[in-house]
């Protein structure tokens, strides 16, 4: 009987989303060498071992995290030599799933932008449209107001004060980041949140919940 908020990227529900982090790994893992020479990144990698593939993935991901949606599209066109993006619909909810979940009294549906951009890298108009469209689409489908929001990725590298102001303007009651800090009731549009991944162990989750991870980050700078 634990309540939960599920934050939804609406473009992924329409089977049009591109979770580039999955496609990037699928591309890298099947290559023994990768060379890039484009506007955004110029580098070569040997990718024969898992370790080498991981390094390459990390390098390219770091670059992609500094790009807008349109720039990411150009990057993948150069990387894969194809305009067609891979389909990962099986990994995500669809509209029927969201509508069914919304009926559960323990579940609250929140917005998470339309296409999961790096908001800080988008223009004001683009960021506003991304946040507003996800809210409006969910409200139209579910028949009620959407009051909660999660910033994509959510760190200070991806979210700016401008983005918080957009969320405020669109009348969200809460918004969560992936920052670690003491919650402030006067700052409900910049709430802290712990990020978890699929392979997270129970021990690692316990370390985050009891505050050890946050203590180490804030006081030991690691």
Regions found by a protein language model. Give the residues of each.
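A generic structural signal for solvent-exposed, polar alpha-helical segments
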Residues: 13, 26-27, 31, 51, ...
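Extended, charge-rich helix/loop segments that form flexible
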Residues: 17-104
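C-terminal active-site subregion of NodB/CE4 polysaccharide deacetylases
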Residues: 1-4, 19-20, 103-104, 114-117, ...
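Alpha-helical protein-protein interaction elements
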Residues: 12-13, 37, 87, 141-145, ...
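Conserved acidic, metal-coordinating active-site core of Asp-based
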Residues: 108-111
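Short beta-alpha junction loops
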Residues: 8-15, 180-181
């Amino acid at each position: 009987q634990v309540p939960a908020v599920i934050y939804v990227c609406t473009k992924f529900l329409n089977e049009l989303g591109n979770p580039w982090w999955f496609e990037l790994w699928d591309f890298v893992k099947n290559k023994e060498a990768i060379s890039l020479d484009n506007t955004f990144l110029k580098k070569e990698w040997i990718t024969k071992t898992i370790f080498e593939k991981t390094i390459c993935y990390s390098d390219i991901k770091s670059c992609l995290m500094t790009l807008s949606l349109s720039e990411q599209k150009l990057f993948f066109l150069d990387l894969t030599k194809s305009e067609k993006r891979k389909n990962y619909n099986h990994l995500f909810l669809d509209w029927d799933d969201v509508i069914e979940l919304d009926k559960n009294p323990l579940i609250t549906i929140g917005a998470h932008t339309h296409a999961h951009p790096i908001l800080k890298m988008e223009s004001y108009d683009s960021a506003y449209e991304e946040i507003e469209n996800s809210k409006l689409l969910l409200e139209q489908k579910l028949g009620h107001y959407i009051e909660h929001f999660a910033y994509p990725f959510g760190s200070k590298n991806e979210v700016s004060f401008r983005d918080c102001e957009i969320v405020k303007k669109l009348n969200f009651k809460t918004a969560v980041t992936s920052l670690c800090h003491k919650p402030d009731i006067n700052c409900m549009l910049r709430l802290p949140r712990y990020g978890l991944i699929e392979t997270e162990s129970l021990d690692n989750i316990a370390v985050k919940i009891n505050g050890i991870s946050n203590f180490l980050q804030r006081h030991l700078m690691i």
